Amino acid sequence: METGTKAPEFIGADENGNEVSLNDFKGKKLVLYFYPKDSTPGCTAEACDLRDNYHRYLALGYQVLGVSKDSQASHRKFIEKYSLPFHLVSDPECAILKAYEAWGLKKLYGKESYGTLRTTYVIDEDGIIIDAIGKVNTKGHTTQILGSEK
């Protein structure tokens, strides 16, 4: 998805079964990140980078929300194990992943399969995508997201 376009509306359930939608973030800036699987090395590094810099996001008026195919129970364990201060949405049917072009063909060790494409969108207060990051540096993702913001 390109910057300057309207972010697709979505409705999903967080780790506690509470409904979460893009509309919940109207008037707020949102970091919406898509990742393959809870508790895997890259996904853990990415989540912990966001956690360790969460105060910076809040200071700049951002909310953070993660989305993966994992179950709500898996998300609860992931949040608890790593003390994540933000919510994670369960998308087992890949509806949100597909709407945000974060589901597609991947190549790993010469084999092709469909899966989650690690992607992050920064969405402004009006629901417009202001940044789209497709080549995520899991250990330094905050630098990619916030760039020159202080």
Residue ranges with predicted function:
Residues M1-K150:
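Chalcogenol-based redox active-site neighborhoods
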